[in-house]
Regions:
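Active-site-proximal loop/helix segment associated with metal-binding centers of metalloenzymes
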Residues: 132-194
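Active-site metal-binding loops of divalent metal-dependent hydrolases
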Residues: 25-28, 59-60, 98-99, 134-136, ...
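Core catalytic region of metal-dependent phosphoesterases/phosphodiesterases
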Residues: 2, 6-20, 29-124
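Residue-level marker for buried hydrophobic side chains located in beta-strands
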Residues: 21-23, 54-56, 130, 211
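Conserved beta-sheet core of the metallophosphoesterase superfamily
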Residues: 110-117, 128-130, 135, 141-147, ...
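Short, basic/glycine-rich phosphate-binding loops at helix/coil junctions
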Residues: 19, 23-26, 59-61, 168-181
Length: 258
């Protein structure tokens, strides 16, 4: 394995042997989901008691229109919860998802968290665990990957964020409606990760464990190259209740329910 490839992947968190991290993603928090918000708060409170770090792998919010929307009813309670946990000594890190990729420095300062590159590493002793939101591995969805490249471009983001907040909300609503329509018509297989892309990441980054969200297909998958852990999405307001994540500590990776 080339050391150059390994050096290019940043380390998000280095845990000591006695430390523990809580990893969650895809909560899609919003003002019309009070029960899910309550479960999130309970999870953060548990992390303060039992963990040293909270790692959020994207899609914490249903969507993000810009850091000038921090006082919105859907966002302010979440920021307040994170800030209180950080003030209590919890290290909080956040990786962008496909819903909240516009969250920026002002959000990070308000919530007292650190923004992460995607992908990056969590290390604990000999353990090297790659963490990612997961959408970059869904390479069979060519249209989505094209869209992802466009909206992650700094120039596109600058132009979008220069528009009035109300207009941004309207544009996002339209994009979400189109996305839901496309997902309803597209083959379900392309919404999942591509096995060859996963194997390529195992090989090029020198890891044997990957943790990601995005697909809403929780589980543990073994391949000859390593183990892939898929985090659950969260839903406690409508439909079947679900939610949780994984703990990372000296004993390895353990899933938990919210």
């Amino acid at each position: 394995m080339s050391t150059t490839a390994l050096a290019e992947l940043p380390t998000a968190i280095t845990l000591d042997a006695h430390q523990r991290a809580c990893v969650i993603s895809d909560l899609h928090l919003w003002q019309d989901r009070p029960l899910t918000l309550a479960r999130f708060r309970a999870c953060v409170e548990r992390a303060v008691r039992e963990c040293d770090a909270l790692i959020i792998l994207g899609d914490l919010f249903e969507y993000w229109a810009g850091d000038d929307d921090l006082d919105a009813p859907a966002i302010a309670p979440v920021v307040s919860t994170l800030r209180a946990a950080a003030d209590a000594g919890l290290l909080i890190t956040f990786m962008h998802g496909n819903r909240d990729f516009l969250a920026g420095a002002s959000f990070a300062r308000a919530a007292r968290l650190r923004l992460l590159a995607d992908p990056c590493l969590v290390t604990l002793g000999a353990q090297r665990i790659l963490i990612t939101h997961g959408d970059a591995l869904c390479t069979d969805d060519v249209d989505y990957q094209r869209f992802r490249t466009q909206v992650r471009d700094p120039h596109w983001q600058s132009q979008f964020l220069a528009q009035p907040l109300a207009q941004r909300h309207a544009i996002i609503a339209d994009l979400r409606a189109r996305s839901e329509d496309r997902k309803a018509r597209a083959p379900q297989a392309i919404m999942d990760v591509n096995p060859q892309a996963v194997d390529a990441w195992f090989a090029s980054h020198g890891v044997d464990q990957i943790v990601h969200g995005h697909t809403h297909r929780p589980g543990m998958h073994h391949t000859p190259r390593g183990t892939r852990w898929v985090l659950p999405d969260w839903e406690f307001d409508d439909g079947p209740q679900r939610g949780g994540g994984v703990f990372i500590d000296a004993e390895g990776i353990q899933p938990f329910d919210a």
